[in-house]
Amino acid sequence: MADMKQEEDELAVDPGVGAVCDPVTKLRFEAIVCLLDRIPITLQQIDMFGQDVAFRTKRIGNIEALLDFLKGSAAATWGARAGAGEPIDASSPELHRLVEDAETAYRDVRGLQPRMVVQMPRVFHKVCLPKLHQLLVIARRLLAQNVALRRLLLQPVGCDVSPMALAEAAVSSDDFERHGRNKVVIDEFGYEDLLRRRHTGHESQNDADDAEQHGREVREGEYEDLILMRHRDTSHELLQDDARRRRADAEAEQQGGDGEVRDEYEDYLCRQLGAVYSGPDQIYEHDMRGPEPAHSPNTPDQIYVPCERMLPYPSNCDNAEDRIHMACLALKNLVKDMEGIYSPRGTLWQYLEDVISLAHALFLENTKLHRFTDQASHQDLPLQPPQGFPFQQQPQHDGYQQPGVPFQQPQQGGYYGHGQGIMFQRGGYLQDVPFQHWQWQQGGYGQGFMFPQAQHQGGYGQGFLSEQPLPGDPSFMNMQAPYDGDGGVLFQKPQHYHHGHVPSEKGAIQAKGKQKMREPKTVMCPDWCRTGHCSSGDGCEYAHSQDELRVIDARPKYRTEPCRYWLAGKGCWYGDKCRYKQHRLAREPLYVDPFLTGHELRNKT
């Protein structure tokens, strides 16, 4: 009974948004973000997708939609070259539907209440746990695909095996399968065979017997991830020696000797991060002195809290290739840590969040990587996207771009942005993305490359750029200026006149008599407040800064009587535009906040 109570208390922990499982995993998250942020193709933020969806719901289920989304996307992307169909395009309605299903599934998963595991253990073990098992396998496959794609981008020209064939065979062969609880098996004819064939001159794909023989010799020992072994000579003799050495180390370790099975780059990461990876089959202890052991879902007694003097990311990775390899290794270790969801003492819901976010982010990044790998050149990362590529590079600036610097409007139907990050959000504004990473799309701001089907509606707040006429447009002089606070609407869409039919002078005089024209620069420009950019430029009648804002004298009775709607507690529809007194609005200048609505005003007051 006490054990069940303790388990219930552990599972009842609310991880919140973007939570991590332990200090080591948190450290690796920081390393991933730091390393990938310095690479031209990056995730920008691992958990951005999780921050942009609803936090809690009351339902359990619909994880199948996310699994189908990941399975179908990965299969369609790589199956096209095998005749299985066309890859899913970023602008296809099918991908949009899958993304919506994934968002729904993510909200449902985030809505899983921790105490339901204790209340309904049968439902959890029969329904949820198998689905989590599948999700973890898919995340590992996506990670293998991601590593292969990154390796492909750095592949030198002139090798015996073409980079595209190498990546295709690598992704198709790196098929992770779980057997039991702590065993991971990789399909035969793995990536190390392809690398060996490139160095030993076995270019022909028909030499299957030789490759299979060498593969068996390699796989007799423990599998070593040669994807990350950059400078390793993979000739036939060295592979045999390596297999014998690894078998001897494994036997010595089982007998309690000093033998050690460790990947050299994994060891390098451990030293740089000051962290320890404790996998399901083996334990990597770091060779520095650390504090007392802390809790880990995989091996509670074998993990160490990082030393305080250690940096959270490698500081001596100067070139892009080293950073890519280190980032891939950090991702690989993170997925290994996520296997702790099978541990009864692990905080299941924190790991579940990480697995889903990582899998979704990996799929989105792989979509971008495919755009580069489909090009003819594989020497370096392309500086400029090719024709038809949905991202366009903007000239780099030092630091953040200051408000008021105009964006260059893209061509019809195009995208605009650095390509540094991915917009997961379907609407609104991201708070953590720097200004220079904003992306413009014909479908409206905030849609991102995943949601290009929306139409630009025009008007204020409907798109990233408003449809106000430019100063050189003939219709610019025919715009109706908004009324002032004494009697009218502040914002009104411009009137466009077609076929040369311009109102006569008499009609203009009558219109001027019916409405009171407002002096310019007395209201803040809504476009400038939202985006830091105004298409009207210096000819805009609205103020673009507090220095330009003109304060006019109000009438004697302006805001001297209380607003009856505000007194009734119902809120005022006019907000700051109301002519009557509303608490703090009495006798204030006629400055209008374009974001403050009546509903927000009611909440504030």
Swiss-Prot record:
Question: Would I find Zinc-finger among this entry's keywords?
Answer: yes
Matches recorded under SUPFAM superfamilies: CCCH zinc finger
Q: For bias kind Basic and acidic residues, which ranges apply?
A: 201-218, 238-250
Keyword Plastid recorded: no
Q: Which Gene3D superfamilies match?
A: 3.30.1370.210
Map out region (Disordered) in residue numbers. 198-218, 238-261, 375-403
Q: Return the InterPro entries for the record.
A: ZFP36-like, Znf_CCCH, Znf_CCCH_sf
Keywords tagged on the record:
DNA-binding, Metal-binding, Repeat, Zinc, Zinc-finger
| Bias type Low complexity, positions | 389-403
Q: Which GO terms describe its molecular function?
A: DNA binding; mRNA binding; zinc ion binding
Ranges annotated as C3H1-type zinc finger? 519-547, 557-585
PANTHER family according to UniProt: CCCH ZINC FINGER/TIS11-RELATED, ZINC FINGER CCCH DOMAIN-CONTAINING PROTEIN 47
Protein name as annotated: Putative zinc finger CCCH domain-containing protein 57
